[in-house]
Amino acid sequence: WEALRNQYAKSSDYTPATAATQASKDLVTKLMGGGPNPYGTQYPQPVGTDGKLAAGARPLWNSDWSDAMEQQALRTELNLSVSGGGKANQYFFSAGYLNDKGIALESGYQRFNLRSNVTSEMTSWLKGSINLSFAHSMQNYPVSSDSKTSNVITAGRTMPGFYPIYEMNTDGSYKLDDNGDRIYDFGSYRPSGSMANWNLPATLPLDKSERMKDEFSGRTYLEATI
């Protein structure tokens, strides 16, 4: 409201009082375009000419975009190893599993790995060793860039709560589709600079970016004493 009032006050067409009045009249339209009034139809001007909320005005929703685009980053790691042998032969085997959920929605990393090492003194003059390892990893990561519309963390912290994640009725209830499910609000009514036609909580589960990688390595040696 204050920014809008100051914008009007710069014009010679307005006095400080009329600039404040015009800002109160235009606030909802400037922020929401043709979208729903966050304070309901009974408060077409939720902010008065003094810059304060009108008496009784309460937001019908306050969307938490960060919460909608983040998840609990649980980490599970399991490791198992076996080793043994005698004077002439020694062995070591290990296996591991890692599941690291990322903080951003649809992000995470999984890895399975195996490793083995066998050393043997085959004769009094010949000994050798073999070392093998294998790792299979899967990484999911949301599309990201410096743009506030593509960076999950930045977008969640930038988007104001008065823009709803789901389409809302004028009484603050959710609009539902024929199956009784909530309908994502892509904000076609949002003004320029407010990420119109955008809703990452809706598109991230469909816009998957995955990377799978297999790594194998082997080393061996023989040593003969002549």
Where in this protein do the model-derived segments appear?
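Surface-exposed loop/interface segments of Gram-negative outer-membrane beta-barrel transport/assembly proteins
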Residues: 1-61, 102-107, 113-217
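Outer-membrane beta-barrel transmembrane strands
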Residues: 71-89, 96-98, 200-226
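Outer-membrane beta-barrel pore proteins
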Residues: 49-108, 119-123
